[in-house]
Amino acid sequence: MLNLKQIEFCLDKIGDMFPHAECELVHSNPFELVVAVALSAQCTDALVNRVTKTLFQKYKRPEDYLAVPLEELQQDIKSIGLYRNKAKNIQKLSKMIIEDYGGEVPRDRDELVKLPGVGRKTANVVVSVAFGVPAIAVDTHVERVSKRLGICRWKDSVLEVEKTLMRKVPKEDWSVTHHRLIFFGRYHCKAQSPRCAECPLLSLCREGQKRDKKGLVKR
């Protein structure tokens, strides 16, 4: 496991690699972000952005999603995985935002997770990106990178990864660390083909060292 100084070194290096890392889901307000993140489960941001480009022209407010039959909304997002269930959740959360929150997306994470289809990860993304609240949202990239480097234990749950990162990373750096770990995992430390040979963290990375000993790191 990495110590705090090593973690700081790793995060600084990742910051050098991806200094402009930010949320890649296109949105213009908190409600659009909630919808986009809800759509992004088990789906790429690129595909979500292709769908929301037209979706957000047709549906601008929570009321708009309730003004059409469920089947119509399902057709509008059909190219996205799990579209039937996601459409149901979008209509349900739209109704709840109108009835319980006066048409405005709640700023509190504990309130956000009450919305259908909004889990802890989605809520953390929304409070961080839309409202500037320090948070670390653990997606597949953040989890993979944290475990490969040895910031977290292999057996840690997603919630344990989040809590470990919150302990080991200064609070003021939570949000930027979240985005940089995503970029590092998405574009460099990929699930199937991590770019270990050109990685500045290879000497510290337990997964990279293991791959190197097996002759899997081609220089």
UniProtKB/Swiss-Prot annotation:
What keywords are annotated for this sequence in UniProt? 4Fe-4S, DNA damage, DNA repair, DNA-binding, Glycosidase, Hydrolase, Iron, Iron-sulfur, Lyase, Metal-binding
GO terms under biological process: base-excision repair, AP site formation
Give the cofactor note text: Binds 1 [4Fe-4S] cluster.
Q: Which PROSITE patterns match?
A: ENDONUCLEASE_III_1 (PS00764), ENDONUCLEASE_III_2 (PS01155)
Q: Does the keyword DNA repair apply?
A: yes
Locate the residues binding [4Fe-4S] cluster: C189, C196, C199, C205
Tell me if DNA damage is a UniProt keyword of this record. Answer: yes
Which Gene3D superfamilies does the record cross-reference, listed alphabetically? Helix-hairpin-Helix base-excision DNA repair enzymes (C-terminal), Hypothetical protein, domain 2
SUPFAM superfamilies reported for this sequence: DNA-glycosylase
Q: Which family does it belong to?
A: Belongs to the Nth/MutY family.
Q: What is this protein called?
A: Endonuclease III
Q: What is the lineage of its organism?
A: Bacteria, Bacillati, Bacillota, Bacilli, Bacillales
